Amino acid sequence: MTDRKLLVSAGPHVRGGASTTSVMGDVLIALLPAVVASVLVFGTSALLLEVVCVAASILFEYLFRRITKRTNTISDLSAAVTGLLLAMNLPAGFPIWMAIVGCFVAIVIVKQLFGGIGCNFANPAITGRIFLLIAFAGQMTTWPTANSYIPGIDAVSGATPLALIKEGAVDSLPAVKNLLFGIRGGCLGETCAIALIIGFVYLVVRRVITPTIPVVYVATIAVMSLILGYDPITMILTGGVLLGGIFMLTDYSTSPATEWGKVVFALGAGIITMLIRNSSGGYPEGVSFAILLMNIICPHLNKIGAKKPFGVGGAEK
């Protein structure tokens, strides 16, 4: 019999019609409405930041794989997705060199040093954002004026809605229509709720994701908002709830495979998000930290709802 070299890659080992490239391509397509909205709201500086983050992420992955003499994986588009998601988590006008540092952390340290796609312990983009938030807090919390591209909706400048809530300036909150169309302060991908919802529908229709995690996450945010005395609509439409719930909590590598595991995963993320938002600490937003914490305990959640193989556990007495 002919000897063959077999390479066992990271699980799950599931055969299906969709390749990594097609899945990542669908994610990029789903993000396009948010990209367009970010340019309409913040101008060409948003597009520049997005292009640089995508290019830097692809370059870092290519160089790392080449230096370590591994098969290059830039064609699977996962590096492009990471770069674009990181850009979506940055404010317009964020220094380019700092964004490139964030791409290095996301691609090289979080993704490639742990073995590449499917082996990372946490979502690379969200970890890169947290690193930048800690290292460059001032730049990560500087918000430019949001331009109005919809007649009848005024432009909004200054703090984000969550920062206003933290300061007790509830009367200064943008109207719901501002939140829906993204005409308010925030990161590039956090502002326009309608664009993110369009992306969500596309991913569900294409069967790239199931609605379980986003729906349970948003529902948990709503319930926790009522318990803690906040307006649920405002809590859902502000910050990174929709961006994180749709595009980052659903990451294949760092989310549970079982249906009940997904429910607990999203439930935990929603509770942690609202507890951080309600705390008296310096961070008005809790989505990033909630996702990272749930990513870390994800392997344990895969045991919830998992079916036992036939013959395991012994006979009933």
Regions found by a protein language model. Give the residues of each.
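Generic transmembrane alpha-helix motif of multi-pass integral membrane proteins
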Residues: A37, T82-P91, V105, I197-L203, ...
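Alpha-helical transmembrane segments in multi-pass membrane proteins
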Residues: D26-A34, L49-E61, S78-G83, A87, ...
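Membrane-interface helix-loop-helix junctions at boundaries between adjacent transmembrane segments
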Residues: S78-A79, L84-G152
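N-terminal signal-anchor module of multipass membrane proteins
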Residues: M1-I58, G311-K317
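Long hydrophobic alpha-helical segments that form multi-pass transmembrane helix bundles
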Residues: C119-I197
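C-terminal ends of transmembrane helices
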Residues: L59-T71, I107-G118, L196-R206, I246-S255
